[in-house]
Amino acid sequence: MENNGKSRGTQLVGQIDDLTRELQDAQKVVVSRINERNRLVSDMMERYRSNLRILQEQRVTVLSELDRYKEEESRMKEALQNLNSTKEEFKREMDAYQLKAEKMRLQKQQLQKQLDDLNKMFADRANEIQKYKEMVTRQRQLDSPEIKLYEKLLGLQIDKADTHMLKFTFTDFGREREYKSVIVDVSQLNDDSSPLRIKEIESGVSASTVNELETVLNQQGIVQFLIEVRKVLVKSE
């Protein structure tokens, strides 16, 4: 019986040491991949911003040209209304006005089409940016098992200073309180007949949930226990 107990103790310590190494390796992978992804996203967003700036400048130019044509049309109409000369001169002025008006109409059509195209390009770029963000999010969800493990056990710290207790502290909850912990009593580690117990956990966790976590700890091992603990702590107040 004693040998089996020692085997369980050795196994648990080995699991914790392996988990610690996995977390350290996974953290390096996470940092490297996040940095690379951030660089790619930053480069992509800068290209989009540069393209949008160019489109905006072109749009301002087109709008300015349209305003100029409108002012010119207004001046021409006013000049014709004030025209007081011979029929021949009036006819020449009118013919010139009609030619110029037709030319301006065609130019305005071209400018309006250019403006419509620019507005469509703006909308297309905005959609591309949104799709790229969604792609990055989907890619992150498909990342390697190491990153998934680290995210599930995000910020895990293991305190083995007390030989009778193991303290697991989780951080990065994104709230005002930045850490939550659970303490496991391992004083009976070398006795197979005595299951491991949770000595201390956050006050918001119910007794029935504690019992469920202890069952996971004793039946499924320390890694699955820690994953389930973090899920519970995330939900607890």
Curated annotation (Swiss-Prot):
InterPro entries: Spc25_C
Superkingdom of this protein's organism: Eukaryota
Pfam hit, one: Spindle_Spc25
Coiled coil (UniProt feature): 8-134
UniProt GO cellular component terms: Ndc80 complex; nucleus
GO annotation (BP), single: chromosome segregation
Protein family: Belongs to the SPC25 family.
Biological role: Acts as a component of the essential kinetochore-associated NDC80 complex, which is required for chromosome segregation and spindle checkpoint activity.
Protein name stated in the entry: Probable kinetochore protein SPC25
Lineage, highest ranks first: Eukaryota, Fungi, Dikarya, Ascomycota, Saccharomycotina
